[in-house]
Amino acid sequence: MTNTIYDITHDADVILLFGSNPEEAHPVIGMQIRQAVQNGTKLIVVDPRDINLAGAASVHLKLKPGTNVAFINGMMNLIIQKGLVDKEFVENRTEGYEKLAETVREYTPEKVAEICHIRVEDLEKAAVMYARAEAAPIIYCLGVTEHSTGTQGVMSLANMAMLVGKLGKPGCGVNPLRGQNNV
């Protein structure tokens, strides 16, 4: 985890919960996420299942299973197209931006909506909400990692966090929930 549990549930404006059902698998964290939402934090749920937290979400994206990377690429494409990139962070702390931008260019909202079986409007809402938030952690679990593209999914989430400068500061980061530490 890049941030503490307290940090990502108390200092966040938006939580991006991806492929995770913390109220079932990590109940203490699930309770803290629910409390954060009750205290005004917005929640984006990306999960094909109707998990309990989806009812509290500002947007619930029920992706077709196996389309995580296409979805994240679509989010990054929108972030770039809408001018929401943290240019200073990208310039000073990353490399390969041009290659990333070239790669995600083909993942238009319409194409991603078709691939993932979601609405364009929901994809756009999630991308803008996440990118514009001052503090927004990505919290993910087995719904991301236990796929043939799990490694690419995690790397894509990290790339998206860096694209908007949400790494290395409170209430942000890329945060896996697992059964054991350092899995």
For each predicted feature, which ranges?
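Cofactor-pocket helix-loop regions in the catalytic cores of large enzyme subunits
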Residues: 1-182
